[in-house]
């Protein structure tokens, strides 16, 4: 299915791609807004050998999943901004308890700089003093840690966004400040299992990310967002290969694909172009392959330079690491 799509819709570089890894894949970062749409579109994931999926939910809809698919999914619950900012520590901790009682073992925070725009414009709540390390959130971290849950966090965005979107810095803050803010949480809660979305938001800062891995043994990352990973990995190919070799046990593969309205109008292109981008990036030695979907932040155009990772590393990031990481919960 996927190769037929490539031949009919994509440039020749994506046809009959060499495949190093032939085993099952675990997509460790997706979003489900419509669970029945996710069921309907599961065949596209299966075409890329995806057998397990971690899906982030905004509502308690896991129970609506068809019984025969229960073993295919692990679910996380999104902690909504309105609830996070209730200013009632007991309420926030109780919310974690509620999610836990419903069977959720992963709690997601979305704390990228755009968050402050949403909170101020939609919720009409000033956020000048709100940080990840604010005492306001301590009850949440403590409860997550005590219950042995996983904290999934997106705390930052690509460097290019800070240069072009997040201006002035006086309003949004710097990327380094945001990374330091999350590190304070890691320091205070060393036993909390933390999954940093999108390579911990640090594919551009491998030295700092490596230091985090060396310092915080319960910190892991997913390599989700084909656009972001392809752009940044390709620009520092040699360094990222060495990084994967050194930290292959701490990296999970994911896509950040959403089963929602975006996935209704351009099917199966939405899925297959991202999957094949990862295949070129991780499994081949192809160089200078044009990214098959837009990258608005990179005006010069993004080309994918394959890392040609060895099978041992691919086995870990595609499957073994996620199985081991999520088995803890």
Predicted segments, located by residue:
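An N-terminally biased module of ancient metal coordination in phosphate/nucleic-acid-related enzymes
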Residues: 1-72, 90, 321
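N-terminal/domain-start segments enriched in small and hydrophobic, helix-friendly residues
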Residues: 46-51, 137-173, 177-193, 206-219, ...
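Distinct, well-ordered alpha-helical segments
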Residues: 38-39, 65-66, 88, 96, ...
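Acidic (Asp/Glu)-rich catalytic clusters
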Residues: 17-19, 42-47, 62-74, 94-104, ...
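Active-site gating/metal-coordination segments in enzymes
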Residues: 59-165, 171-173, 220, 225
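Hydrophobic faces of well-ordered beta-strands that scaffold small-molecule active sites
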Residues: 26-30, 52-55, 74-77, 107-109, ...
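Acidic-and-aromatic substrate-binding clefts and catalytic sites of carbohydrate-active enzymes
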Residues: 31-38, 53-62, 82-91, 117, ...
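H/E-rich (His + Asp/Glu) clusters that bind or coordinate divalent metals
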Residues: 3, 9, 35-36, 193-329
